């Protein structure tokens, strides 16, 4: 799947789940589960509850996503 097929959203981490999975509350009110991208995992970027993050999701499954950036 190419990067053009992904939709980006911003949200806040509301809950930490096992295996580096997080529950994200999006700005539009929806809740999705997301995992950390490989580049963030490689660079040891830590994500805590309450952090603002940018996630990308496919148009095919709007319940799961990938965290691609942690806001400062």
Curated annotation (Swiss-Prot):
Keywords: Cytoplasm, Initiation factor, Protein biosynthesis, RNA-binding, rRNA-binding. CDD domains: S1_IF1. This is Translation initiation factor IF-1. SMART domains: S1 (SM00316). It is found in: Cytoplasm. PANTHER family: TRANSLATION INITIATION FACTOR IF-1, CHLOROPLASTIC. Pfam families: eIF-1a. GO terms for molecular function: ribosome binding; rRNA binding; translation initiation factor activity. One of the essential components for the initiation of protein synthesis. Stabilizes the binding of IF-2 and IF-3 on the 30S subunit to which N-formylmethionyl-tRNA(fMet) subsequently binds. Helps modulate mRNA selection, yielding the 30S pre-initiation complex (PIC). Upon addition of the 50S ribosomal subunit IF-1, IF-2 and IF-3 are released leaving the mature 70S translation initiation complex. PROSITE patterns: S1_IF1_TYPE (PS50832). It comes from the Bacteria. Residues 1-72 form the S1-like domain. Its main location: cytoplasm. The keyword Glycosyltransferase does not apply. Component of the 30S ribosomal translation pre-initiation complex which assembles on the 30S ribosome in the order IF-2 and IF-3, IF-1 and N-formylmethionyl-tRNA(fMet); mRNA recruitment can occur at any time during PIC assembly. NCBIfam families: infA. It comes from Xylella fastidiosa (strain 9a5c). InterPro entries: NA-bd_OB-fold, RNA-binding_domain_S1_IF1, S1_domain, TIF_IF1. Belongs to the IF-1 family. GO terms for cellular component: cytosol.
């Amino acid at each position: 799947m190419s990067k053009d097929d992904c939709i980006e959203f911003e949200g806040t981490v509301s809950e930490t789940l096992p295996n580096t999975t997080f529950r994200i509350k999006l700005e539009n009110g929806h809740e999705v589960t997301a995992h950390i991208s490989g580049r963030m995992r490689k660079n040891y970027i830590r994500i805590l509850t309450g952090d603002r993050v940018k996630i990308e999701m496919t148009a095919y499954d709007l319940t799961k996503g990938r965290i691609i950036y942690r806001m400062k």
